[in-house]
Amino acid sequence: MRINRYLRLFAAALVLFFAGVVYAWSILKAPLGEEFGWTPAALALNFTITMCAFATGGLVSGLLAKKVPAQLRVAIGGLLGGGGIAAVSFLSGEAILLLYLLYGILAGFSIGMVYNTGITTPTGWFPDKTSLSSGVVMMAFGFSTLVLGKVLQAMFDSPAFGWRKSYLLLGIGVVVVSLLTAPLIRTPKPGEVPPAAAKKATPGENFPPLGMMKRISFYGLFFVCTFQAAVGNTMISFAKDFSLSLGASASLAVTLVGLLSVCNGVGRLISGALLDKLGLRKTQYIMALVLMTAALSGLAGVLAESLVLGVCALVLCGFSYGFCPTFSAAATLHFYGGAHYPLNLSIINMTLIPTSFMATLAGGLVESSGGYLGVFLVLTLAALLASVVNLCLKKA
């Protein structure tokens, strides 16, 4: 039976929606700190470990792409990742190293495998809509924190569940969804892609990983993705406190954090549509404009103590952050071809490692200076550098 390619896209989006919960650490960590007395710094370290393992898992998935079927990578990644999350429910207060091992390393690494597979596989079914298909699954991944995060928060507060049962059910959910969707997530066989779609595909020159890494454009792309993601990731890390500093009420600050997440998800879909409609070059100009406007709005908001400008900065940072993964996927495919796409993209996604440390450094700057002026000066400089380099990226 021929399965519609949109059903396969839905399967990839669904598994990434559940896998994306690994990013909801700001919510998932709360009951652990309360029950075990683990410090914010110790819990923050777990997220850094998670991001490093996530990027490494994506790299391993890329290395295995030509040897291990996508279905098997999703199934194994989901099984181990969900198992790691579920195992956290059995932790005691003396076992923070086990938290790092189970959630940080095991779940982070395994879900990184699922992410790489879920992002790269749909493009084979949509050669006519590569960026839009990537944007759809990336939006699902981004919305996970907002939707599942709220569900988990309610479960934590409910006497019927509590944090232990919530972690257990979450892990089981990741396992079940991964195993159910895995059979649908595979690369197309010859003749399976609709002829009308295949005709629109425009394959370019194919670069193997080492060939890609010999190109100056690779380092430019890595730089752009690192600094653009750093701006968004940093803003996410202090969005609530930043809003409060500009006079927002506690409830409004929480709402604005949610709004930033929504914009992040929508930005992934919009950027995918723009990339397919306008092409890479024109989208790069839009991307640079949004990033610079976001950083300058935040800086102006701090200087003028304006909540309105602060809200603009949060919204635009969300959109800008959403552009980043879709752009990196499209640029990798456009510059370096599809023959080695899963592995090449996993190498580009190693930007997650330096990015995860930048948000921590920004938090230290806020703490030491007692305000956000220094941070936004740094973010504006980072945005400027990323935008300039981005506009210089024209070919492989």
What are the language-model segments listed below?
Residues L260, L269-I270, K277-A331:
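C-terminal transmembrane helical hairpin of 12-TM major facilitator-type secondary transporters
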Residues L32, M113-F126, S133, F323-Y336:
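Intracellular juxtamembrane helix-capping segments at the cytosolic ends
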Residues L80-G93, L291-L303:
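C-terminal ends and interior cores of transmembrane alpha-helices
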Residues L32-G33, L64-A65, V151-A160, S243-L244, ...:
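Interfacial helix-cap and linker-helix signal at transmembrane-aqueous boundaries
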Residues G57-A70, R268-G279, E367:
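Helix-to-loop junctions at the C-terminal end of transmembrane segments
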Residues W25-K29, M213-L269:
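Extracytoplasmic gate region of multi-pass secondary transporters
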Residues F141-T187:
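Helix-loop-helix hairpin linking two adjacent transmembrane segments in secondary transporters
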